[in-house]
Swiss-Prot record:
GO biological process: rRNA catabolic process; rRNA processing; tRNA processing
CDD domains reported in the protein's UniProt record: RNase_PH_bact
Gene that produces this protein: rph
EC code: 2.7.7.56
Protein name: Ribonuclease PH
GO molecular function: 3'-5'-RNA exonuclease activity; tRNA binding; tRNA nucleotidyltransferase activity
Sites where the protein binds phosphate: 86, 124-126
Oligomeric and partner information: Homohexameric ring arranged as a trimer of dimers.
High-level lineage: Bacteria, Pseudomonadati, Pseudomonadota, Alphaproteobacteria, Rickettsiales
Signal sequence annotation: none
Family: Belongs to the RNase PH family.
UniProt entry keywords in alphabetical sequence: Nucleotidyltransferase, RNA-binding, rRNA processing, Transferase, tRNA processing, tRNA-binding
Amino acid sequence: MRQSGRKSNQLRPISLELSPLVNAEGSCLIKIGKTHVICSATCETTVPPFLRGQNQGWVTAEYGMLPSSTSQRIKREAVLGKQGGRTQEIQRLIGRAMRCVIDLKKLGERQIIIDCDVINADGGTRTAAITGSYIALHLAIRLLMKKSILKVNPLISQIAAISCGIYKGETILDLDYLEDSDAEVDINFVFAGNGNLIEVQGTAEKKPFSEEQFLAMLKLAKVGAAELFKLQNQVLLGS
């Protein structure tokens, strides 16, 4: 039994609050257990220099954690004068993942910036950020189409992410911080809506894991992702 009382295949309680921010084209506050992330999507009429004149858009992402989002206060990276390696890795992951589910040609010569700000961290911030960012992106595209800025919907697919790992010899879904910090294996899976993989980030923390164990984690992660896709659809259809 997990310390939280959850079953091995059980997600933490999840909520998706639409449009908590009034200025972004799309936004979402995602809560997965005690991990809370605000995700927003903002549209700009400029693109990176390497895309100018190509009639193609771009999606990029920025990620950050509030100083009090963890048990011990973390210093703002702006004060330190540079982003940490973890921050850069996560925001690149989010940007790559989002670009996989949008037709950049149909976006036209504009850029959508995804901002993910962690309010409270209890494991799985990057996976929560990706799942919430899809909602923000979807709402932004919906608004751009309503305003006739976009004529065709450039979204190709849903996207969601979830962690899976081996903790005390058991394959478990959606690791919280205590589980993540003591797991033998920790893998983040990013899925498209049809179940295809977009990205896999995995590490053996204590000893190597077998192909059989990996496939068991993949199978469990697919079940979790299916629940996330269902929840995304429910909140979007009701908005």
